[in-house]
Amino acid sequence: MTDSHKIIAVVDDDPEMRAAMASLLSAYGYGAETFDSAQTFLTCASTSRATCLVVDIQLGDISGVELAHQLAADDFTYPIIFMAALDDEVIRNQAVAAGGIAFLHKPFPAQTLFDAIKKAVR
C-alpha cells in the first residue's frame, strides 16, 4: 500500500490543529480523516479506513489514553501516536502503557510526526 492509500485519523478537539494536520498529511501524500472528539471517532471506528491514529491526550470528552483503552476493549488495534501540549512524564508513561508507539510534544517538527507514522504503518 502506498502512502497515498494510507489513511491517518487525527483526533483533536482543536479545529485549527485538525485542519493543519490534515493539510500536512495531504502534503506528504497521506489521506486524512479528522475527528473532533474521542466519542466521534468511536462512533465511526468500525467504518474508518485509518491505518494509524494521531490522538491528542487532552480531549474535551474523554482523554486520548481512555480512547486507546476503549478501542482495545472493542478489539480495534490501531497503532496510536499520542500528542500533547504538556510534556509530562506521567502522561507520557500512561500513553506508552496504553499502547502508544510515540508521544509527541506540541509543537513538533513535521519530520518527527512522519517518522512516527512510518514506524506505525510499515
Task: Locate the predicted segments by residue.
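C-terminal output helix
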Residues: V90, F108-K118
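The feature encodes the CheY-like receiver
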Residues: R18, G60, D88
